[in-house]
Amino acid sequence: MAQFFKPKKKASVNTKHQSVDVVRLDHNGAGIAFVDKKPVFIEGALPGEKAIIQFIEQKKQFSRAKLIKLAQKSEKRQTPICQHYHECGGCNLQHLQHEEQIVAKNEKLQELMKKQGVSQGEMVQPIMGEELSYRRRARISLMLNKQTNQLDFGFRKKQSKAIVNVRHCPVLVQELDQHLESLFTLLNQLKGKKHLGHVELVQADNGSVLLIRHVADFNEKDQQALVNYCEERNLILYLMPEADVLNHVRGEEPFYLIDGTKIYFTPKDFIQVNRNVNEQMVEQALSWLDLNENDSVLDLFCGLGNFSLPLAKKVKTVVGIEGVDEMVQRAKLNAERNQLSNVSFYQANLEEEVSEQVWASTKFTKILLDPARAGAAGVMETVAKLKPQTVVYVSCNPATLARDSQLLIQHGFKLTRLGMLDMFPHTGHLESMALFER
């Protein structure tokens, strides 16, 4: 007899309102309560609060719940600065006082290291910048609303593809925020507005950059309107008709300064969004490395040379390794433009075996890593085998930092300093820096 597949029925969710006590924050900034010894994650709730919740997801190991109301509020709660806060998917901690965000992130960093059995050494003061007007980069989503024939212009809603219409963003630098209203008006006047993909705004040290992604060519009138708009406001304009095609239409080539070094970039390239914190981060990393003129330094995940180029001004040689070849080529050009002949850049996938690479058998006295959220598991064995005196690890994910730290410690390194970087105020994102010494 044929057997027919019967899908399992989805477990029903208990939607009855329930009162819980919030005890702490998770690493993304959600409140955690416990019901029948199982953690319940509640977006928008703070430790010390009594919350009325409604379950939206119940699994064997954990549950998620919606915050209905607060029966008891934390004294650390504040009114969010942004009118779009409860819809927009950008910030998720504006309801917590900024100084308490720092405390919570510091505690989370230490907790994750302890959980992995990593002895943390000295906990240094966090690197901080402005609480607001700190983001020098924004990606603005666009969608033609067929009912109104107007563009939805703003940021994605939380856990949704829908767009929150935004004309002011308090965490954007003022130089970019001031253009949102007029840019919305301009784009809505274009005949080809239905062919728009998204817009990116980037603040360089030599001007504001506007990138427009479009899926069909602009007619002559639309293109001239864009150029006129940028000329009136002295904006650097790029058009992107395809994902891998970038046309520089007007303005200078953008750059930012770090430690007196000009780093040129395109709006496709990764740069740190927080200028102030980035400058302090580079300064601290160079200080922790305790550099001298005879040092040879390996910079892994080097990007455009954010660390490599300032390093090259202080040591004998620097080798930078980056996975994206376009950024490697720009890093080389940046070195030439800054007349730095003692730095070399190579392309390599640092998630794969690298022991056969030429640089992997070179003697380095110091190593710096700045990997993406996935961490540097693929290259940590090589780092340890190179036996540098010092390793500085800059991390945007404390969980992978804690994991990768274990391997260095197994090879005789000690974690001597650890510090948090407040790169993204009002969000759950946690950047950190760790110093390992042999």
From Swiss-Prot:
Catalytic residues (positions): 396 (nucleophile)
Top-level taxonomic group: Bacteria
Record's keyword terms, sorted: 4Fe-4S, Iron, Iron-sulfur, Metal-binding, Methyltransferase, rRNA processing, S-adenosyl-L-methionine, Transferase
Cross-referenced CDD domains: AdoMet_MTases
InterPro entries cross-referenced by the UniProt entry: 23S_rRNA_MeTrfase_RlmD, MeTrfase_TrmA_AS, MeTrfase_TrmA_CS, NA-bd_OB-fold, SAM-dependent_MTases_sf, TRAM_dom, U5_MeTrfase_fam
GO biological process entries: rRNA base methylation
Keyword Metal-binding: yes
Matches recorded under SUPFAM superfamilies: Nucleic acid-binding proteins, S-adenosyl-L-methionine-dependent methyltransferases
Catalytic activity: uridine(1939) in 23S rRNA + S-adenosyl-L-methionine = 5-methyluridine(1939) in 23S rRNA + S-adenosyl-L-homocysteine + H(+)
UniProt GO MF annotations: 4 iron, 4 sulfur cluster binding; iron ion binding; RNA binding; rRNA (uridine-C5-)-methyltransferase activity
Family: Belongs to the class I-like SAM-binding methyltransferase superfamily. RNA M5U methyltransferase family. RlmD subfamily.
Function: Catalyzes the formation of 5-methyl-uridine at position 1939 (m5U1939) in 23S rRNA.
Protein name: 23S rRNA (uracil(1939)-C(5))-methyltransferase RlmD
Native organism: Aliivibrio fischeri (strain ATCC 700601 / ES114) (Vibrio fischeri)
Protein's gene: rlmD
